[in-house]
Regions:
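Extracytoplasmic/secretory soluble proteins
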Residues: 11-12, 20-541
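Bacterial Sec-dependent N-terminal signal peptides
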Residues: 1-11
Length: 541
């Protein structure tokens, strides 16, 4: 995007957040938040603990039914015994979670706790206004670890009228690590068989490589182009090609705050044309809109897709998601030998942009139907999960069995694979309710991921810091609540798929789309949001 001001990624990386709790490495800082809230919740907490009766807490997070299926799982038992809760799954998957949660919010069937990427969407404000979700207690002094966590800028920025309605799930140390949230893995072995001798350095070279693989079809499997591991990932490859950071608000050339998506019409045309060309040429698979996790993984594993867009907190996540299965099929060490991660490629202006979202992707929410007793139990749960003891249990396992403490540091035992050993950790995210495992970005954090895979994450992040361009963005505006802003809905993924797969000229479709948004009140919404930003003293940097 040509109009937004930019700051070097290297400078931002130096500002890595120091408030992340150290989990397996040491003790977290504690502090109190003192306000004028009543003590009903803390009283309920004391009463429940005195009675020693576990409080049933229903929870919806990806794969919860599997993660909570063994009541005797040592990690799960440790959490429940330490907090006085009994976790009950209300299952969602990566394919259906948002639809299910929005439906439950409408029909009153929300679980006590649910997770998702909702804070920047219009219905977050609606949930607050309609009383769908409950705010955390004003006084969190009884829960010092939770209180410390809620000082996070993202949590405070998303508050309403002094109330905190969501708990950020910490992902990374700073925003530059969000490059790990959109990655492309491709079959370098097949590219070489197709006559490619150099790994691609540009978008054009990448597309030429995929087309060469498809044309040669070296393994005779009628291989197709690039798929995505989950719905809505493909934009993370497309939009940076035009400098668009579609999750953020920026300042346009007129000094007006706008979603990056709407900041420059020509940039949007460029991005959509790039997507259309890839789709037409077969670089992007024809059934990309139907992509589902297990299907996409299997197609890539079987050599039926030449490339795949994925998240998984970076390439290190490939080991558990597909690398081990690949090695089982094709021989030990074959995945790292046969596959490569796409580098950052330059846009038309020469800058190498990348997907930018947040250092805390997704949030945990509490249903308004939760009473004081349950709220106290939920606060105890999160307070424990943010404690040193809780993080060690969730991410390091059982002391003496899975890890030892040597000179004050946790050292994982050789051969330990928590995801294979514990049902609580296998193929689900229930263990990441409070935060994502720091092992994906913090190289000093104890981990059972192979060093070779962790190094892939380090290399990708280094590419972003040294070579990437991070436009200046304004989360203070992103989280503003105004009537028109809360009601205005746009979906960059749906727009992308519609135009990419469309038959009319891209430029016409983009103009028609923008006209449609204008008819829905885009300009009025922007004027209202900018007026509110001015009232709050938010200025263009």
């Amino acid at each position: 995007m040509k109009k937004a001001k930019r700051i070097p990624a290297l400078a931002l990386s130096a500002l890595m957040a120091t408030s992340l709790l150290v989990g397996c490495g040491g003790a977290p800082a504690s502090s109190s938040v003192t306000t004028d809230d009543t003590d009903a919740v803390s009283t309920a907490s004391s009463t429940a603990q005195q009675e020693n009766t576990p409080v049933d807490i229903s929870i919806a997070i990806w794969g919860a039914d599997e993660g909570l299926s063994d009541p005797n799982d040592p990690i799960l038992k440790g959490i429940e015994e330490a907090t006085g809760v009994h976790l009950v799954p209300q299952n969602v998957t990566w394919d259906d979670s948002e639809q299910k949660i929005q439906l439950w919010a409408t029909n009153g069937q929300l679980p006590d706790i649910f997770a998702g990427d909702f804070v920047a969407k219009s219905f977050y404000g609606n949930w607050i206004e309609q009383g769908v979700i409950r705010a955390l207690p004003d006084d969190l002094s009884a829960y010092p670890n939770l209180a410390e966590h809620m000082k996070m800028e993202r949590a405070q920025a998303a508050g309403r009228d002094g109330k905190l309605y969501m708990i950020p799930r910490t992902t990374y140390g700073d925003i530059t690590y969000s490059v790990l949230d959109r990655n492309v893995v491709y079959r370098w072995d097949l590219a070489q068989k197709a006559g490619i001798t150099k790994e691609p350095e540009t978008y054009e070279e990448f597309c030429d490589m995929i087309k060469a693989i498809i044309a040669a079809d070296p393994d005779g499997k009628s291989i197709s182009g690039m798929t995505q591991a989950l719905p809505e990932l493909i934009g993370g490859f497309v939009y940076p090609s035009a400098g668009i950071i579609d999750k953020k608000w920026v300042a346009n050339e007129d000094g007006q705050f706008v979603p990056s998506y709407f900041a420059d019409r020509d940039d949007l045309v460029d991005a959509m044309q790039f997507a259309r060309d890839m789709y037409t040429d077969g670089v992007i698979e024809k059934d990309i809109a139907l992509a589902k996790l297990e299907t996409s993984k299997e197609k890539y594993l079987q050599g039926q897709s030449a490339a795949m867009v994925f998240a998984w907190s970076g390439p290190a996540g490939l080991e558990a998601q597909i690398g081990k299965d690949y090695d089982a099929l094709y021989g030990e060490g074959s995945f790292l030998r046969d596959n490569r991660i796409a580098k950052l490629y330059p846009a038309k202006d020469g800058n190498k942009y990348y997907f930018v979202d947040t250092e805390a992707w997704s949030e945990s929410y509490i249903s308004s139907k939760v009473d004081d007793e349950k709220m106290a139990a939920i606060c105890r749960l999160f307070d424990f999960l943010y404690s040193d003891e809780g993080q060690r249990l969730v991410y390091c396992g059982i002391e003496g069995e899975d890890y030892d403490v040597v000179n004050g540091k946790v050292v994982m035992k050789d051969g330990v694979d928590l995801k294979e050993k514990y049902t609580f950790k296998k193929n689900n995210n229930v263990g990441d309710l409070a935060m994502w495992n720091p092992e994906f970005w913090d190289s000093d954090y104890p981990s059972t991921i192979s060093p070779e895979y962790r190094e892939l994450n380090a290399v990708r992040h280094e590419d972003a810091v040294k070579n990437g361009t991070l436009p200046t963005y304004y989360d203070g505006v992103l989280f503003l609540s105004t009537p028109l802003k809360d009601a205005f809905v746009y979906n960059t993924n749906d727009d992308l798929l519609q135009i990419m797969m469309g038959s009319e000229p891209v430029e016409k479709m983009v103009d028609d789309m923008l006209a449609s948004y204008e008819a829905k009140g885009l300009s009025e919404m922007l004027a209202e949001a900018n007026a509110k930003a001015a009232d709050l003293g938010i200025k263009v940097k």
